[in-house]
């Protein structure tokens, strides 16, 4: 686990690399990251030492690839800065998000689409899960995100998400 309040992005990533390295020595593995967790996994995969086996597949659940518009809007809010720390600032930074980079691991993005609409829509009509938009979790280095009609927080607990992951892993085995 990690605490965005007390740890910066690089410190969390540095702690994650040996964990993934140990996992890789046990054989074939996959990684699943939700939201910031997916950003941390991408950074950690890119920081793995040479010769360490990469994951067979990376699943990103509502994990921003592009800077988060909510993080950008909240970046000057004292409470947001206190709670999210350096990681919250990273999520709103074009330069820092680009610096995380893409991974060469086969990647599947899964995005929620049950966010607010109308007057309370912070995403200007873009499909979203209430925290990130479909555009923010999209990239040209993997297929379009698979859409699931749920909110950001519930995405990891979604039966539909589990089915998608299991189906993709079965397809990978063929």
Q: What kind of region is each of these model predictions?
A:
Residues 6-104, 124:
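Serine-dependent carboxylesterase/thioesterase catalytic core
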Residues 1-5:
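A short beta-strand-loop structural module common to alpha/beta enzyme folds
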Residues 102-174:
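C-terminal catalytic-base region of ester-bond hydrolases, centering on the histidine
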């Amino acid at each position: 686990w990690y605490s965005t309040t007390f740890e910066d992005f690089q410190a969390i990533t540095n702690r994650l690399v040996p964990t993934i390295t140990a996992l890789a020595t046990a054989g074939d593995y996959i990684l699943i990251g939700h939201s910031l967790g997916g950003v941390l996994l991408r950074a950690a995969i890119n920081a793995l030492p040479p010769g360490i086996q990469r994951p067979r597949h990376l699943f990103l659940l509502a994990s921003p690839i592009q800077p988060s518009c909510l993080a950008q809007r909240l970046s000057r809010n004292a409470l947001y800065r206190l709670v999210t720390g350096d990681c919250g600032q990273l999520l709103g930074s074009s330069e820092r998000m680009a610096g995380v980079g893409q991974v060469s691991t086969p990647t599947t993005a899964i995005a929620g689409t049950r966010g607010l609409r109308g007057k309370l829509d912070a995403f200007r009509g873009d499909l979203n899960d209430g925290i990130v938009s479909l555009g923010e979790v999209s990239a040209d280095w993997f297929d379009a995100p698979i859409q699931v009609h749920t909110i950001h927080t519930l995405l990891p607990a979604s039966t539909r998400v589990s089915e998608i992951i299991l189906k993709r892993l079965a397809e990978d085995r063929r």
